[in-house]
């Protein structure tokens, strides 16, 4: 697990790590549609809502770490959800992963967690090493 430190990872998680003022979410769309990305803080309060045009296949959204009022948010864990809306008005949750850079490894009992800045995620949720 220590070999992952310093690497950017693709992670199966609804928690996007805001690191150095940036959070990255990758999502898949079956076709062209509008994607509404909602980000909430640890208290469950809405922080950012962004609407982007999604194309069929892989898409990415890079959050600049600001809230809807333009104020920079503290680095750490935020919860994300993505809802797709087709031109016909049909809505559905879109599958997504998050990207983050591993900054450390911790062990709690038998669990091994990766540190992504101020965010801690289970090692088992890592899908791939991006770089």
Where are these regions (language model features)?
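Type III/flagellar secretion export determinants
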Residues: 1-131
């Amino acid at each position: 697990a220590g070999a992952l430190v310093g690497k950017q990872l693709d992670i199966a998680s609804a928690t996007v790590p805001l690191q150095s003022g940036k959070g990255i979410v990758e999502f898949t769309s079956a076709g062209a549609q509008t994607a509404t990305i909602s980000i909430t803080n640890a208290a469950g309060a809405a922080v950012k809502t962004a609407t982007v045009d999604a194309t069929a296949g892989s898409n990415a959204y890079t959050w600049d770490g600001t809230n809807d009022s333009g104020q920079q948010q503290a680095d750490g864990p935020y919860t994300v959800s993505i809802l797709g809306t087709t031109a016909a008005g049909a809505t559905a949750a879109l599958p997504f992963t998050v990207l983050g850079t591993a900054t450390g490894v911790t062990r709690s009992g038998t669990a091994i967690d990766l540190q992504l800045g101020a965010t801690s995620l289970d090692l088992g949720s890592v899908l791939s090493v991006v770089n």
